[in-house]
Amino acid sequence: MKYKTALLTMVCTLCMSATMASPRDTARVEHLSMWNQLSAPLLGNPALHGATYDKSYSEMVLSVDCQHQSEAFVEEKGKGHVLGALAVNSYLRMNPRSAVWGSASYTTGKQKSICWNSTSDYELLAPYVMADTLGGDTHRERYTFSGGYGTQLGRVLLGGEMAIRAEHEYRDRDPRMRGIVTELLLRGGAGLMAWHYRWGVLAEGTIYKQTNSVDFYNELGVIPEYHMTGLGTEYGRFAGEQRSLAYRGGSFDIAFDAVPTGNEGLYGHVSLGRNAYERLLTSANSLPLSRLIYNKVETTMGWKQESKHHWAAYAHFAFTKRSGDENLIGKSDSQYYPVIGKLTMYKDYLMDASIGGMYGQQGGDRSWMVSLKAGYRNHRERYVYPERLLDRAHAYVKVAGEWMRPMSRRLSLSLGADAGHYARVSDNMVMPFANMTSKFAEMIRHKYRFVKASYTEAHLHARGDYHLKSSSIGLFAEVAGGMVLCSEREQQVGLRASVGVTF
């Protein structure tokens, strides 16, 4: 209830600030144009975010998002979802040197047919999740709040931002999983205007907590819960009755940015980060079972020019190394389990390199853009002993286009489309299937089938904005749909519909 009260308060506050908004069409194009994808890394630095847009723009949106897969591409994430959301986003230009922005959202719905995962935030915590062979649908509720401020003092740029996420995921039939997540993010940024550039530096940190448990109301239907350790392995000593976990951790990132203040020039972004998450068995006096560590590096460099025709070319590289430490647990004494050592057993390497470009026109209340991107992606997972390996590589190409234009004094239209293809280049698997149970072997074969597959995707979206007479308030409706075709003769379809208010 307290989250809903806070959400309503923020919505009302932002609506009261609507009188600060600038002309709708020009602001809409400035904030929503595809050209802004080039500036996406800069928005992470609140000092640069405060100088990114000239005009205020706010919107409140109610949406429904549906997705269905004929067979789960990733069993741990399920076969699809039905989610409804209410969100408000606002960027207010206070004066030529200062801006404030904020957002709030509430999302609720159902995740369908999850298997081999009883823990929330699978993508963040994998492979160290609790799992069973039955699974089922889960219900989700998520609240998010964020706010930031950026200002310019002479040639110095300063900014700060805070964001909070609270999430509850549960199942109302056996096995009754429950995950309660809280995450706090803090950002601080600084910048300098010099030599026709904005130079920025960012420091960012998160604090993460999750409590996770599984219960059975039918004593005759109890099945084991496994504490997974990667690539079909599990902590067998604590499987079965130990069904309460906690996750504690966080992250720290630094980033450096450079963007030209004029209409053309080189731009660049470099970020370094580290995440660490510890898994604790709360049903055994908070025994630490494992620790997952991320080390990340990402860089983008390109050239952009804004004139009658906008164009840009860039190169991007990202690398993430994840390693998992498993604790060696000694003999218990009165429910106390001593940790006598640790071994780094799980290793995961993900590399993505790409080049791309964008071309089009953007001015005032209209815009059109096309983009092309091509790259190579390699993902390698390894478990040290007994040796297990899952390696795959894909080459990909993506193309996208967007058209935004006023149709009359009150009606504006936006159309967009994108398509992509991920082609398998190589794959390799090493697994001791002779020593694996049939359920675990089936799970690994399913995973290998889809991670090595090739994929083709296409998406369309259309949005109409209607501006009320003699008012800065507008109404809009948007519909988007897409399809993903898998070379394993499976597919995914999705549809999203939204209505909202701009101010």
Model regions and ranges:
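N-terminal, post-signal peptide beta-strand-biased segments of exported outer-membrane/organellar beta-barrel
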Residues: 19-112
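Outer-membrane beta-barrel channels and translocator barrels
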Residues: 93-97, 152-156, 193-197, 261-263, ...
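Transmembrane beta-strands of outer-membrane beta-barrel proteins
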Residues: 56-62, 99-104, 156-162, 197-203, ...
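Long, internal scaffold/assembly segments composed of regular secondary structure
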Residues: 233-374
